[in-house]
């Protein structure tokens, strides 16, 4: 309901005159324009005059109240007093439209919010009392650890790392996490275990001249020897296959009246003829070349033994070989190791016997001496510069002090024959034993035992 508060001044005075004429003695208060702007009616007369409420909208007279009563001004939004039910309904609608809408609270709001339930078929567990983890992933605490559950008609299991249900094929037995997550987790956690057979602590590798618990495999190969003698201006080539992998790498020889034989590596027998009076056959150049070729790993420079005094045969000479020297061999004398084992290697040379330990566990290294020459008769033989010469006054063969780079030494001992030294350039091999010096055919039958040491 709207009020028209603006009235022209002429209409106000005309209305006051009409009321005054019809009132019969009492002049009602006139409504002025200023009072109309403030309220619906004003007090225009004295104390005895009546007040009127002017309805500006309808233009009719209001109800007259008692004397001294203050006029009541209608306020917008409030239903008029004394009006019908239509005015009251209109005021209530205006008040409802001006108030903001509010959301319902309390029990109604709790009923509208749905509580999550367990995703397992047939489970009616109330998750409102469970932890937030179980409410968020919609699984109860019991089914999160169950190895087999049915979800949407399929057999599944809850993965505690993925926080999801997976099929049973994605799990390992007795594992609560799926295989995909455990694969990367175990790879980061577990350290690789070293192979015990390939461990460096289990098998010591060979460093320099040290020994390993197992024999180092060496490849089988064939090498070509090049032999040149002083008498012949030509070189002779010999190719001998070496069966290194076999355990028959031993020197097995025998002494005969005709000469000294060296069957080496099962390649046949080679005779070194000395031209002795006991039926020895002189060794020709071809036999000497073949013998030196066979013994190429052992000798750097080998000279054929000269015939003794009074015996016919080939003269002394030198043979040069291009192979590496790992052992020294003197065919005029012999040394033997005491207490040699049964599987040791033996060489029978001219009445003496050399007993050598098996070489399959002793790696051969650098050459020991660069040259070796056989002398004849009672004269002194020319050896390498590292050892002094000693000549017996009685005309017997000279003995020598042999000094090698491996720290092997043998003092000067007078005997009837030159001594054979078999050594290895292994600086860290220690071996204590005795050398037996003297041949079987010595004149006095005495022998000397010499201590020696390999450092």
Swiss-Prot record:
UniProt name for this protein: Squamosa promoter-binding-like protein 16
GO molecular function: DNA binding; zinc ion binding
InterPro entries the UniProt entry points to: SBP-like, SBP_dom, SBP_sf
GO cellular component, one term: nucleus
Zn finger (SBP-type) location: 115-192
Domain remark text: The SBP-type zinc finger is required for the binding to DNA.
The gene coding this protein: SPL16
Organism: Oryza sativa subsp. japonica (Rice)
Cellular compartments annotated: Nucleus
Motif mapping: Bipartite nuclear localization signal: 175-191
